[in-house]
Amino acid sequence: ELEYRLIRESKKYGSYVKGYSTTWKEIWKGLKKDDIAIEFCTYYSNNTEEYAAVLLEKKSKYPTVVRLFSQKQLSTIPTTDYYNTTALSNLIWKPLHHYLAEKKNVYFSPSGELNNIAIEYIPLTDKKTFAEYYNTYRLSSTRELIKNKREDIRTKAVLYGGLEYERGQGDIEAMRKELQSAESLIAFRDVPEIDSLVLRKGISFLEGTEREVQTIDTLLRNKQIPVALMSGMAGTEESFKQLSGQSITLLHVATHGFYSPLTGHYTAQRSFEEQALSRSGLFLSGAAASLNMKKIPEDIEDGILTAKELSKLDLSNLNLAILSACQTGLGEIVGDGVFGLQRGFKKAGAQTLLMSLWKVDDTATQLLMAEFYKNLVSGQNKRAAFLNAQKYLRSYQNGIYDKPEYWAAFIMLDGIH
């Protein structure tokens, strides 16, 4: 009965775009002999949350369901063991070993708590991670395999970084005048270097993000890619919302991300989603005033961009969004996915996301991002550019950043081309 229910539910995948549906047969037709598509899912049995995997491979004419483990079993593994032992692989990948034989490409869509774990980077053996044995692709849904892809990122780019989170009355008045007079807050021009940026009380200034976006700005401009660099007080929520409907293909946001777990019980799905999306977001220029409970004029945004607000934008031209911030991948976990920034961006229409799952080291992030963009502008596709940047970081200065805490935080979602 369980297998029948899971297979029946797998025939129609949910979509971030209303009215879009895909059958497993369409996905199956597009698979090659050495491909396997894995849709992880959760279900309840005897009041216990259980995990299973629905597998699609070319040699099987129907989906295969494999029961995996319970949430209770998962919770017994310390998070410190995730990327240093094979304990997690024994629950997730070992039961699928038979199906992975002779496979080269593994396309998987996580569910439940697996959204918050980089399961592609967990050790499969004492020497290698899962991703070192297979070409792994993390997907928001395996339906992504049959969607049309856009690989070109050269049209326009917008970079947010080195943001000032504090703002005084003068900043607010200046912003009001700019809003009244300017047609657009996004200008594709150079932005002067911001002086006297120091560590703040509350939301701390991320000094490394200023260097990060300046480096990326130079790399892109050298390749004749139009760039708008939003730093200091320029990286406002107003400017971000003006991206909606524009032909922006590359967006880089280097700032603080936030995630606040949802408390209480919500029976209505719509209410749950709205509440959960409101608890993930990004801090943009001027956000500290709102957090410090300062009064902000009604015609000025608070600088706190929630995933809910993000989801209502039109970012359908966005080929790649890079979220270089703390905990940007996190959100409220429910059965059909994660209600966080990744949900917000996908609902807005973004194709590929590169984001972090936990607080990231500033210097390591700068190194990884700079190398990623070097690879990208040299002609590598998104996935190759990312994987090679990880390898570079791990080998940097004789491996000072080789521990997973430095490089495994970043995941690429829907990075297929």
Named regions from a protein language model:
Residues E3-Y4, I119:
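Short, charge-rich amphipathic alpha-helical segments embedded
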Residues E1-L2, E9:
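Amphipathic alpha-helical coiled-coil segments
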Residues S10-H417:
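Catalytic cores of enzymes
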